[in-house]
Amino acid sequence: MSTPLKVWQRWSTPTKATNPDSNGSSHGTGLDMVTPVSGRVSEIQFDDPRILPEKISELEKELFEYQHSMGLLLIEKKEWSSQYEALQQAFEEVNECLKQERNAHLIAIADVEKREEGLRKALGIEKQCALDLEKALKELRAENAEIKFTADSKLTEANALVRSVEEKSLEVEAKLRAVDAKLAEVSRKSSDVERKAKEVEARESSLQRERFSYIAEREADEATLSKQREDLREWERKLQEGEERVAKSQMIVKQREDRANESDKIIKQKGKELEEAQKKIDAANLAVKKLEDDVSSRIKDLALREQETDVLKKSIETKARELQALQEKLEAREKMAVQQLVDEHQAKLDSTQREFELEMEQKRKSIDDSLKSKVAEVEKREAEWKHMEEKVAKREQALDRKLEKHKEKENDFDLRLKGISGREKALKSEEKALETEKKKLLEDKEIILNLKALVEKVSGENQAQLSEINKEKDELRVTEEERSEYLRLQTELKEQIEKCRSQQELLQKEAEDLKAQRESFEKEWEELDERKAKIGNELKNITDQKEKLERHIHLEEERLKKEKQAANENMERELETLEVAKASFAETMEYERSMLSKKAESERSQLLHDIEMRKRKLESDMQTILEEKERELQAKKKLFEEEREKELSNINYLRDVARREMMDMQNERQRIEKEKLEVDSSKNHLEEQQTEIRKDVDDLVALTKKLKEQREQFISERSRFLSSMESNRNCSRCGELLSELVLPEIDNLEMPNMSKLANILDNEAPRQEMRDISPTAAGLGLPVTGGKVSWFRKCTSKMLKLSPIKMTEPSVTWNLADQEPQSTEQANVGGPSTTVQAATTYSFDVQKAESETGTKEVEVTNVNSDGDQSDINSKAQEVAADSLSNLDVDGQSRMKGKGKARTRRTRSVKDVVDDAKALYGESINLYEPNDSTENVDDSTKASTGETGRSDKAISKNGRKRGRVGSLRTCTTEQDGNESDGKSDSVTGGAHQRKRRQKVASEQQGEVVGQRYNLRRPRRVTGEPALSKKNEDIGGVQQEEGIHCTQATATASVGVAVSDNGVSTNVVQHEATADSEDTDAGSPKRTDESEAMSEDVNKTPLRADSDGEDDESDAEHPGKVSIGKKLWTFLTT
């Protein structure tokens, strides 16, 4: 809301003062007003009193306009304060949003840590798998040793077979020798043979027959043997088919292993992602370190600024010792508020830390459970592998047995060679599987490292974001009123940073442990590679041995074939010899034939029986082995499919979870960036407002300099007035009265040290900069008093005695119509001194602008030109921010002191007019000591008529009536201080006024404090005496300028007033300025006079002395005001 302001445009540009009491100092030229005034106080002549009422009425109108603008400014102040509260609410909402996002970040960090723990468990499982593989390698070595042993045993068996063949050849040779002996006997008996040739020929025919029969039987035997060979070949085919089935099952197993390898590759990819995350976390840690460096640099800058503020504080403390009590109270309140905020912040931090620790523990437990489950699965797999290996060993044993049974035959050798080749293929496949498993383990290790890197990176980024958010909060909260809170928050930030560092150290330690584990794992893999190389060498040795065995077997086969051929040749030879010796050996051959046939049949039957038994056993063994293998394969297939489905489901679930988490993290980052932009924009807006406020403050400082020059001009006018009085002393009628008048010397009232004020105003800019840091210190650091009680302090003590309605607090609930008759009634009793005092209103506002710190901008802006109206709104905002704390304590006294100089001045003008008429045309009675109520009645009648007009002029704004009323009552107080020319009849009216105003004092003390105090009330006003005591403590800075200016005004025209500010007696005797101000009718005046004397003698101001200023009306005869003396002079 920007309301138009009515600016006071009557005074002209002041000239340079030439008063000898002003210490010869001059300040700023000031801004020119719009319209100059032709007449001034120095030009007032007593021979033309008709001009005085007009000028006084003009001045009063200008005061009305000034007060109206003041009310508008206060309304604008209230609106700015409401806007400030709205901004504070928005800022709190932003802080709540930041807290929620921080919690979300903590949850994301917990999830990432859970993943990290799961990956660690997977690493443990993989290590266990590596150990299992080592065990499997050991078992393979044992199997190789067993194979070597079996090969050696088979070689020994082959050697035994060779030896048996050699023994048989020896037996054949023995038989040949026996045949040679028989041939010798045949030769011997050749004669007998010749003899019996005929018998031999006869027998020869019979032998031929028998031979043919033997050949037939031999052919039948060969047919049976061929059938047996075919049966053996079919059995071998069946064995080959079984082996092919086993090979197919092995292929299926390999396919499943390939699928498992693919899943392992996926896990390795995840490990790589974790490593990338780790890299990101390291980068985030570097950013956090940079931010910590920035924070340390900012802390150093703050320390330098604090040193500067300490220097300024020392200079201010020398000037503001009297305000220490107020400072202590404010500091205590600030400490309480800061302590509460710090406690709340600490509680929030503790709660967040506890939640974080609980989440971490839960995640660790879940990861441990998952690791245990994975370990159990690995153990199951190991048991299955062991079972498979046992079955394979059993199969190998069965094959070994079969090979041992067929050692005597060539087909048995071929079967053994095929079995050896199959086992070699199986070994090669197992080696390939080991290599693939090794690759999978390496990939899994890389995936785990990548996941760990990701987790660390995410945690680092979250920590960096948290630190940035905290820093932004601290920067927003670093104001001048909350410096101590900011320092405490900095200490808490340091603690949090230390905690983060400890956490980072723990993470680094964990990373180092993982690196050590990785190195140990790599060492183990190197050992496995060495073992694998050894195994390969052993396999090469085995293959060499196998090749040697094959060569040896081939040689043996060739040797056996040669032996068979030789044996056949020998048999043919024997047959030929037998044919030659048929006749001789007919009988022996028949006997031997019969014996051989029997033996051959027995051996044949035994061989057939053995072959059939072996066939049955082999078939039954093969069927059982095949059934067992089929069952095992089916069970393995089911288990493998189940495991495959589980692993695929787990992989899909992990992918979905990872995608969701990535989306959530991206959304959170976008939100944080948006909020950062909003916070930056708000911060820039606040900085722009601060710069505008500083510009306005500079303008106000210039205006204060201008007002000082006007005050010096007013002092020069006072000197002219005194010169005019001295010229009138030559008059016969006026000389006697003026000779009796004793004017108080202006030298007794020390003028303000303008050089000090200039220094204070020159230091206004650095104090404005300090206000950005601590408005409380800046508000307390602008007093005008020095180490001693200066001229301002004396003026304060003087004006506290001059206010007749100081202890009474007019109620804001009064209507303007009710207030105006009272003010006019009191104004009609005023004397001629008001004509001079009315011209001092401007200096009243000047001194109040110089002395007050919280409200000086509001007091001065009303005298600014039309061109400065645009700056007033911005100034009112700063005043609302700086003066809210002061309004809680001394808002009542300030409101009373602002506006007590208006309506009474109007009333005193009428009295001056009446007195002028009486001077020239009417005979007026002299002073009478008794009270007369007639003058009071006349004055009240005159005031009521004028009140109606003023009510009509002011009641246009209903909202401003309460404030205007309070300002008018304050105005009447100062007019009471200035209207000293009343007769004795005025005393009764003054007493009645005081009684009426004391009745409503308690109500107004509470309402006025709440009218323009835009903060929540922190205390409740009590009795009038207690409220005045708080005024004297908290509102010293505001009251001081008001009373000082009033004292200056009265001193400038030579007016000496009593403690109550109301003249009740006119004494035509010589006045003693050093006497005490006492009232013969009231004993309470003794205390008040003591307080007055203490203030004059530069002693501290007491609150109790001000509480009783309005209790009496009498004045000491030796200190009668110049107004009263002028009144007696005019009436005589």
Swiss-Prot record:
Bias (Basic and acidic residues): 849-859, 1095-1105
One term under GO cellular component: mitochondrion
Compositionally biased tracts (Basic residues): 895-907
Observed effect of gene inactivation: Reduced nuclear size and altered nuclear morphology. In plants lacking both CRWN1 and CRWN2, moderate dwarf and leaf-curling phenotype associated with endoreplication and strongly reduced nuclear size. Plants lacking both CRWN1 and CRWN4 exhibit slightly smaller rosettes. Plants lacking both CRWN1 and CRWN2 or both CRWN1 and CRWN3 exhibit markedly smaller rosettes. Plants lacking CRWN1, CRWN2 and CRWN4 or CRWN1, CRWN3 and CRWN4 are extremely stunted and set few seed.
Coiled coil: 73-714
Keywords of the record: Coiled coil, Membrane, Nucleus, Phosphoprotein, Repeat
Phosphoserine modified-residue sites: 774, 803, 865, 883, 908, 1093, 1105, 1112
GO biological process: nucleus organization; regulation of nucleus size
Motif Nuclear localization signal 2 per UniProt: ranges: 693-700
Expressed in which tissues: Expressed at low levels in roots, leaves, flowers and flower stalks.
Subcellular location: Nucleus membrane; Nucleus, Nucleoplasm; Nucleus lamina
Residue numbers covered by motif Nuclear localization signal 1: 379-386
Biased amino acid composition, Polar residues: 10-28, 861-871
InterPro entries xref list: CRWN
Superkingdom: Eukaryota
Protein's membrane topology: Peripheral membrane protein
Principal subcellular localization: nucleus
UniProt-annotated stretches for the region Disordered: 1-31, 849-871, 883-909, 924-1039, 1061-1132
Family according to the record: Belongs to the CRWN family.
Protein purpose: Component of SUN-protein-containing multivariate complexes also called LINC complexes which link the nucleoskeleton and cytoskeleton by providing versatile outer nuclear membrane attachment sites for cytoskeletal filaments. Required for nucleus structure organization (e.g. size and shape).
Matches recorded under PANTHER family: PROTEIN CROWDED NUCLEI 1, PROTEIN CROWDED NUCLEI 4
Assembly information from the UniProt record: Core component of the LINC complex which is composed of inner nuclear membrane SUN domain-containing proteins coupled to outer nuclear membrane WIP and WIT proteins. The LINC complex also involves nucleoskeletal proteins CRWN/LINC and possibly KAKU4 and the cytoskeletal myosin KAKU1. Interacts with SUN1 and SUN2. Binds to KAKU4.
Protein name stated in the entry: Protein CROWDED NUCLEI 1
